């Protein structure tokens, strides 16, 4: 596969935001991971990250084979997923666009990263490994992410029902951010994307 990382670069605002969130060490890991993804996939930037939860692998059954795959744990700061149903795998897909913007159909392709597993805070490694993939994806150009999880706490719901999250409180006492003690999470959840998912 050719080395197609020449176009890989973060704009000043993205670099500043990533640096503010990750600190110097996390920024270095994120950039290194983004370069690894670009080298392994031959794609300098990706558009979307999808992180699958337990039992969600079948959600992509209708997608074609990925253009490239690598182990999540090969990326700096990312650990081998240990939760049941999670895999140590990151896939790169090319997906045709077919959405409307300003009333007109937009063509082209999406470059999509799909993580088939993740690290959870309850595993005891602290927040760094939990957010490492998200930071790497941001450094790789990703501007939107879809996080999928199993909600076993909702006993009245059926398997496969979809719920979108619009806000949350961090009650863990743990934070991956360098900076303010309280981070307002309302802007994290995208209302337009939630609408597209059918909430």
Predicted regions and their residues:
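Active-site rim beta-loop-alpha module in soluble metabolic enzymes
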Residues: 187-199
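Accessible peptide chain termini
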Residues: 1-2, 199
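Metabolite-binding pocket within alpha/beta catalytic cores that recognizes anionic/polar moieties
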Residues: 2-185
């Amino acid at each position: 596969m050719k080395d197609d990382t020449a176009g890989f670069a973060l704009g000043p605002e993205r670099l500043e935001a990533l640096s503010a969130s990750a600190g110097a060490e996390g920024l270095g890991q994120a950039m290194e991971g983004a370069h690894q993804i670009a080298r392994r996939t031959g794609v300098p930037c990706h558009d979307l990250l999808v992180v699958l939860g337990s039992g969600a692998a079948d959600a992509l059954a209708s997608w074609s084979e990925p253009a490239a795959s690598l182990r999540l744990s090969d990326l700096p700061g990312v650990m081998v997923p240990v939760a049941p149903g999670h895999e140590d795998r990151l896939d790169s897909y090319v997906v045709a666009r077919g959405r409307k913007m300003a009333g007109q159909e937009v063509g082209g392709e999406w470059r999509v990263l799909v993580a088939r597993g993740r690290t959870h805070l309850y595993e005891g490694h602290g927040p760094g490994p939990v957010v490492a993939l998200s930071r790497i994806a941001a450094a790789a150009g990703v501007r939107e992410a879809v996080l999928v999880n199993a909600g076993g706490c909702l006993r009245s719901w059926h398997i496969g029902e979809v719920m979108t999250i619009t806000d949350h409180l961090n009650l863990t006492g743990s934070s991956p951010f360098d900076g303010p003690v309280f981070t307002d999470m309302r802007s994290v959840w995208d209302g337009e994307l939630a609408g597209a998912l059918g909430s």
